[in-house]
Amino acid sequence: MSVLSLSDLPSRFTFSSESSSSSSILFASTLASESRLSDLSTGSIRDSDCFSFNVHELNQSDEILEIDFRFFSKKKKNEHFSKRRKLSKVLTPPTNDEIKFVNRHTGSKPQPNFYSSSESSEKELIWFQPKMRVFLQSLSNMSYLSPSKFRYTTVYSKQPNACCIV
């Protein structure tokens, strides 16, 4: 999976801003043809390479109680569908090993608002904007996504209330 620079993003991705009721973050992935998202029970998104989610009921402990996923098709711009998933995860600061990992993988230092999953079998290293404390369990562990679809992931900030994963 390739890592794009911020200068590459405007022409490739559309960012959704934070709404009054939830934090909306756009995820985008440069997936190879063999790594397309698999069919979901609610529809096919083989040609899709991006999705967004809204966080609901974020409590004082930064636990996500519910997430809405929206998948988008590149070929059919108006085609999309949603899938709601309940989560309950808590953010944790990065360990020294994780900091070394992200330095080795991206060649840059993590920011103070850097968080990662200590439970993930495949380290998902994610940066977030302040107050955007969103913790996803490893995408490869989500039952409706193929285990091989997502590997190492970095979040890039494009505007105050939007982030992008490539």
Swiss-Prot record:
It comes from the Eukaryota. This is Uncharacterized protein C1565.03.
